[in-house]
Amino acid sequence: VALLGVMRIRWHAGAILVLLGLVLLAVSSPVEAPSAPPESATYAILISMDGARPDALQAAGASWLLEQASYTLKATTVFPSVTLPAHASMVTGLTPRNHGIMQNDWRPGMPPIQVPTLFDAAKARGRTTAMVISKEKLRALARPGALDRVEVVGGRAEVVAERAIALLTRERPGVLFVHFSDPDSAGHLHGWMSSPYLNAIARTLAAVGRILKTAQERENGTFLLIITSDHGGHGRIHGTRSPEDMTIPWIALGTHVLRGHEIQQEVRIYDTTPTILSALGIPQPPSLEGKVVSEIFF
């Protein structure tokens, strides 16, 4: 009887050790979601709709775009919620305290951003880079040697789209940044969510659609296209911590991007660069604060 009791104790102890080992194995070997598409994208397009609120996209009829995309209408920008600091976060993967741009002012002769950007990382891997912008101050994002082409285009969204499409079809950059100022201009002049503002959103969406169509019809290449904004607005201003100013759309489309998928993870404006680098197969600099929005890929 005593021997039988000892055997039972040893059996229970052994079973406990086996179970403990299985638990430790499960903890040390988690099943992780993929952080990148199975095939690196040939090129990436980043589109900024300056001053575009998510509810404005819905009001202007953006359902056709969301049906093709992985998206969230609850992404957040950085504070201060103004153009230059927010765009710097968009293309660096950093918050303003770490990329150093806190002011919304830049003029020719002033130094550009001092930290590496998406364009630096792409160039280091042999990708060509280009920027089509409708605000001169966004030249602050162009570090020496990081961009092969920078075009400042005056005029409405249609004109900006024409230049972007020309670059896509002729020069085929590996990373293209396109900036539309129409929503922001209409918001300051007429008020956010006013009829002229919503008309500007609709025009810009149509221009975005032309760029998307060009990417979808382009042969010999896979792509990632991200559409987002630097800030929202209320009344005729922005720059505060209010939800109307801080909430932005974040929309991804591409060869290996899920369609009609509402993103569940939290998305910040500075997640944009890590996600693009991941799609292009470019290693993430360890300094990045942003995270890859991995759930968009299949």
Question: Residues of each region from the PLM?
Answer:
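Active-site-proximal N-terminal segment of extracellular/periplasmic enzymes that hydrolyze or transfer
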Residues: 31-70
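Short, structured active-site-proximal loop/turn typified by the sulfatase FGly-forming signature C/S-X-P-X-R
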Residues: 54-89, 94
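Substrate-binding rim/cap in mid-to-C-terminal beta-strand-loop elements of soluble/periplasmic
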Residues: 87-91, 241-283, 294
